[in-house]
Curated annotation (Swiss-Prot):
Role description: Involved in the gluconeogenesis. Catalyzes stereospecifically the conversion of dihydroxyacetone phosphate (DHAP) to D-glyceraldehyde-3-phosphate (G3P).
Annotated pathway: Carbohydrate biosynthesis; gluconeogenesis; Carbohydrate degradation; glycolysis; D-glyceraldehyde 3-phosphate from glycerone phosphate: step 1/1
EC annotation from Swiss-Prot or TrEMBL: 5.3.1.1
Gene3D superfamilies associated with the record: Aldolase class I (3.20.20.70)
Protein name, per record: Triosephosphate isomerase
Pfam families in the cross-refs: TIM (PF00121)
């Protein structure tokens, strides 16, 4: 199974996402994609659409670990269920750094949505300073981001996104990707995605790299042409 996912972050309006989704479903129909390809997109909360498309799934970028309640600025399971959404990103570095989500908080979110049967995209990644400390330090750092996470959960997808490569246009080298993914494969048998400045130019090489089961795409997923070019690179 190859997984191609697009994280829209705080981009695209509801109308833009609706247009994007309609075009994507049509293009995937024409491509006659196989059952070995999974395509997911993650719009912002105000742009969520009902998850009823033929060839791809809608997921959420974030949600609080509750059915509903007094959690200003958040959404809960009830809101996701209304859209028939059962996919969620957890642990993204921007949630960890910008919003102060620590490992205990992330663990609670993971357990809640695992119990709800969600497919979970669990993100891990290191700052450049940590990578520069060497392989053992990197292994310890990434391993700590898996503390408390059930790595045997059958609907777990691990997305490795080196923080220094996110949104910078500077992807990790193929050697760095293979080395890190091979190390992560000693922790878990879950699918391993790479994220960090993935684009139509480098997607095929990344997808052909050993231990890489797919990609989590950021800015290159916002344009239907570039995103579908990345999907085509998986064939």
């Amino acid at each position: 199974m190859t997984i191609i996912a697009g994280n829209f972050k705080a981009n695209l309006t509801r109308i833009q996402v609706a247009t994007f989704a309609k075009e994507l479903d049509s293009i995937l129909t024409d491509m006659q994609t196989s059952s070995h390809l999974q395509v997911d997109i993650f719009p912002s909360h105000t742009a969520l659409l009902t998850n009823n498309f033929k060839h791809f799934h809608i997921g959420a970028q974030n949600a609080y670990f509750a059915q509903n309640g007094g959690f200003t600025g958040e959404i809960g399971l009830s809101q996701l269920q209304e859209f028939n959404i059962n996919r969620l990103i957890i642990g993204h570095s921007e949630r960890r750094t910008l919003f102060g989500e620590n490992q205990d908080f992330i663990n609670k979110k993971f357990r809640f949505y695992a119990e709800a049967g969600f497919e979970i995209y669990y993100c891990i990644g290191e700052p450049l300073s940590m990578r520069q400390k060497g392989k053992n330090a990197l292994k310890d750092f990434l391993g700590a981001q898996l503390d408390g996470i059930d790595i045997t959960y059958p609907k777990l997808i691990i997305a490795y996104e080196p923080i220094w490569a996110i949104g910078t246009g500077e992807s990790a080298t193929l050697e760095q990707i293979e080395s890190t993914h091979s190390m992560l494969a000693t922790f878990t048998s879950a699918p391993l995605l790479y994220g960090g400045s993935v684009n139509p130019t480098n997607a095929r090489e990344i997808l052909c790299t050993p231990y890489v089961n797919g990609v989590l795409v950021g800015s290159a997923s916002l344009n239907i042409q570039s995103f579908t070019d990345i999907i085509r690179a998986s064939k």
